[in-house]
UniProtKB/Swiss-Prot annotation:
Role played: Catalyzes the ADP transfer from ATP to D-glycero-beta-D-manno-heptose 1-phosphate, yielding ADP-D-glycero-beta-D-manno-heptose.
Region ranges (Ribokinase): 1-312
Cellular component, GO, one term: cytosol
Family annotation (Gene3D superfamilies): 3.40.1190.20, HUPs
Alphabetically ordered keywords of this record: ATP-binding, Carbohydrate metabolism, Kinase, Multifunctional enzyme, Nucleotide-binding, Nucleotidyltransferase, Transferase
Presence of the UniProt keyword tRNA processing in the record: no
Gene name as annotated: hldE
Residues annotated as catalytic: D259
Identification of the protein by name: Bifunctional protein HldE
Amino acid sequence: MLEFLSQQKPKILIIGDFMVDNYTWCDCSRISPEAPVLIAKTLKEDKRLGGAANVYANLKSLGADVFALGVVGDDESGKFLQENLKGEFLIQKGRKTPFKNRIMAHNQQVLRLDEEDISEILLENELIALFDEKIKDFKAVVLSDYAKGVLTPKVCKAVIEKAKVLNIPVLVDPKGSDFNKYSGATLLTPNKKEALEALKFENLEGENLEKGIKKLKEDFSLRYSIITLSEAGIALFDEGLKIAPAKALEVYDVTGAGDSVIAVLAFCLANEIEIFKACELANEAAAVVVSKIGSVSVSFDEIKSFKRVDFEKKIKSKEELLVLLKQNNKKIVFTNGCFDIVHFGHIKYLDKAKRLGDVLIVGLNSDASVKRLKGESRPVNSEFQRACMLAAFYFVDFVVIFDEDTPLELISFLKPDILVKGADYKDKLVVGADIVSRVELIDFEEGFSTSKIIEKIKDKK
């Protein structure tokens, strides 16, 4: 899919609150004698595209042919946006173009200074007329709302209705607690906080998530309902609830993660990619973005590199693993096996196991353990080779090798939340079941086993 998408250049129109993100990098090593505050010595300034302009930058970085429509003030920030974006901007005299100045010290944001005018624009009719003139040439429309006054109810209604007549998808990154102005859009991408405010729910845990995301779809006549869940991934409701798990390995700055998500979703829908696959790809894009500092764009090459993470680093000792698990409050899924010759059945089984939680750990029998269990002719592949093959799958987070005949000692040491075994354990004692919160039995794909593969090879000789 990535190879296909990286060759596409869909025309995408973006309307919304275009902003300037400024980063003032400082050295803060002294305390002021005037007051108990830090002295910030300016080292450099970095002006970047922000808000809807960052969505534009993400789409352009992905390879889209992007066109911006918006309203800016007659100021330096407005000029900066016009000079750096392809599109058409209406100039509202006296209006302040949103400008956010982040004061950075030692890679940490210590203060943000905002200049903006959040009143509704005076040029609604002109913006709608401009949209009507341009829309027929595009494959998707993005409404990027930061509640700075451009996306008024009148503008949103006109855009969504016109696009719907032309069968052009409209994707909305919403703001505020009233989503009525987005009714009829293809999808919205609220985060958990925004969704809670719109739904007036106390939480989105357990059954509430499915109830809430379904309610958004029905209440606002959406084609798809999406809620971004930060480190838990992306929730999608089409005909039912699905969760695309998050992919981030390290998080430095969440600025712009939502922009990358809607950019990837728009790019995918413009190319008629299935929606759940689009959500999975959006997660990978967000993982790239949060590993950097500031509002940054993401490319398909970066997503490819992210997917090719050094898999040997995923092979850990149980002691290393325990330290890592203590640092994060994640739902841990554990399964184990010999995985001597990895086959299609293993892949389907492990993929299903991963979907049960946040982190999937595979306990792998050592060579000595396999030999005791399977006989002198096994294993076919060494423990290191087997561990590397398992670690190469994106849905496997960690592999840990154990020498015992059963994983009981390892399970007791790591104390995972969920223990996964094959459905053939239905009437058997599951080792470690008394240690974990729950046991899940997963059906194997019929006709696939390492023993059958070995016999097949022998028969051909």
